[in-house]
């Protein structure tokens, strides 16, 4: 009797030289950057992301000694505008090359992490193909989206945790949270992962203790040296960046970098299941309360995932990001990159038949297509299709939840993911 081949065995059937794959991925991204120049000059629909022009304008204000927040709709850390000042001094393409470089750095970190997990070079590179030759990250970074920077910071954090360099990991984590708010959800699984684990005999003795005693023991182990070091260094990094930019730019830095994203209620159509509710209640006195209440499902699911899967930190962070994006108040296509950059690390431990994986992938694209159809009619024909967009968003939510359930049910924790002692 033959068993269905899972995607790990399917990848092993290919001989993938790492240098060749990275070279092709680099050339493809460079070609897309220059194609974007051509399309921007010749076609009505521009290739370059509108946010890239916002970044460049903000960088221009920085070069003039003024605030980047003089540019309307700039809702990012000033650090990004500082990094893109060569857009003004050298070439407007500098930022795109920076983003595709971070894109490739993300792939390299994926490769190194897979090697640390015990995979061979050929198999590790085979999994990296799902990022290197994925058209979505290729298009997003070459269009001028900065999410590849955050992806590389998140992967750097996980890499240095695996290498047991806790202080280095904490520095990168502090930068990641400063650049984007979503990695802050990783702090609980990271802390649980770094705390010392009890042996079997200690577990048996602990089971006879009261709830208060078990809670005290849990908190005591949570205050281990590794956890305290990580929290202290990450906190100092984040606070130092925030204090420095607050000193220079004042309240507008806090408002546009942090508070805007915490209280954001985007009533424009997007993939979020909440958008239609927020759209209909935009003028209601309950609008703000409903927006805050939307965090509750995220909080419950993220907490459950943390305690269930913290031993495999990479898998736990993948679940965290997928849950955060799926149940967020705002969800656009670029948000998918937040968890797709972790998918190659998860794939070796998800023993799923490749045919089922292909079916799930097709459903994922079908869900987006069903949403894009009424969204196109709304944007370009001006017809009221909000209800259909919302229903398509609910269907896409169902698809994403089904995919997550399938990934969890086929997840097999390997011996390669055994706990590392940090103390």
From Swiss-Prot:
**GO MF term set:** glycolipid 1,4-alpha-mannosyltransferase activity
Q: Which residues lie on this side of the membrane: Lumenal?
A: 39-89, 191-224, 309-329, 379-384
Q: Does the keyword Electron transport apply?
A: no
* Principal place of residence: endoplasmic reticulum
Outline which residue ranges sit on the Cytoplasmic face.
Answer: 1-17, 111-169, 246-287, 351-357, 406-423
Q: Which GO BP annotation is one of this protein's?
A: GPI anchor biosynthetic process
Q: Which UniProt keywords apply?
A: Endoplasmic reticulum, Glycosyltransferase, GPI-anchor biosynthesis, Membrane, Transferase, Transmembrane, Transmembrane helix
Q: Where in the cell is it found?
A: Endoplasmic reticulum membrane
Record field: transmembrane: 18-38, 90-110, 170-190, 225-245, 288-308, 330-350, 358-378, 385-405
Q: Which PANTHER family match?
A: GPI MANNOSYLTRANSFERASE 1 (PTHR12886:SF0), PIG-M MANNOSYLTRANSFERASE (PTHR12886)
Question: Subunit details for this protein?
Answer: Part of the glycosylphosphatidylinositol-mannosyltransferase I complex that is composed of PIGM and PIGX. Interacts with PIGX; PIGX stabilizes PIGM.
Question: What name has this protein been given in UniProt?
Answer: GPI alpha-1,4-mannosyltransferase I, catalytic subunit
Organism in which the protein naturally occurs: Mus musculus (Mouse)
- Supply the source organism's classification: Eukaryota, Metazoa, Chordata, Craniata, Vertebrata
The UniProt gene name for this protein comes to Pigm
């Amino acid at each position: 009797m033959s068993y269905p081949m899972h995607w790990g065995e399917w990848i092993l059937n290919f001989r993938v030289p790492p240098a060749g794959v990275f070279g092709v991925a680099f050339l493809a991204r460079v070609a897309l950057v220059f194609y974007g120049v051509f399309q921007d000059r010749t076609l009505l629909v521009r290739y370059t992301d509108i946010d890239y022009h916002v970044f460049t304008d903000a960088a221009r204000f920085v070069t003039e000694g003024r605030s980047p927040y003089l540019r309307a709709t700039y809702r990012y850390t000033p650090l990004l505008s500082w990094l893109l000042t060569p857009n003004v001094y050298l070439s407007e393409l500098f930022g795109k090359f920076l983003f595709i470089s971070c894109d490739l750095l993300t792939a390299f970190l994926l490769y190194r992490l897979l090697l640390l997990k015990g995979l061979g070079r050929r198999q590790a590179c085979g999994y990296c193909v799902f990022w290197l030759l994925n058209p979505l990250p290729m298009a997003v970074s070459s269009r001028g989206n900065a999410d590849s920077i955050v992806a590389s910071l998140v992967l750097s954090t996980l890499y240095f945790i695996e290498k047991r360099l806790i202080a280095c990991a904490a520095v990168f984590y502090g930068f990641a949270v400063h650049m984007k708010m979503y990695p802050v959800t990783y702090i609980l699984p990271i802390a649980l992962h770094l705390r010392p684990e009890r042996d079997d005999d200690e577990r048996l003795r602990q089971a006879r203790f009261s709830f208060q005693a078990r809670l005290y023991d849990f908190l005591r182990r949570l205050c281990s040296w590794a956890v305290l070091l990580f929290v202290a260094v990450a906190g100092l990094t984040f606070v130092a960046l925030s204090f420095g930019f607050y000193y220079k730019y004042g309240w507008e830095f806090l408002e546009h970098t942090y508070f805007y994203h915490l209280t954001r209620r985007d009533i424009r159509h997007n993939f979020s299941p909440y958008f239609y509710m927020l759209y209909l209640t935009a003028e209601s006195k309950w609008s703000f309360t409903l927006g805050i209440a939307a965090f509750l499902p995220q909080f419950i699911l993220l907490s459950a995932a943390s305690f269930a899967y913290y031993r495999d930190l990479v898998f736990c962070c993948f679940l965290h990001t997928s849950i955060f994006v799926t149940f967020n108040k705002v969800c656009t296509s670029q948000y998918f990159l937040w968890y797709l950059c972790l998918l190659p690390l998860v794939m070796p431990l998800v023993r799923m038949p490749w045919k089922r994986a292909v079916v799930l992938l097709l459903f994922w694209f079908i869900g987006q297509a069903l949403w894009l159809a009424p969204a196109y009619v709304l944007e370009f024909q001006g017809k009221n299709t909000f209800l259909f967009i919302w229903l398509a968003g609910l269907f896409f939510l169902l698809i994403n939840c089904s995919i997550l359930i399938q990934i969890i049910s086929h997840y097999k924790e390997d011996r390669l993911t055994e706990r590392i002692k940090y103390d």
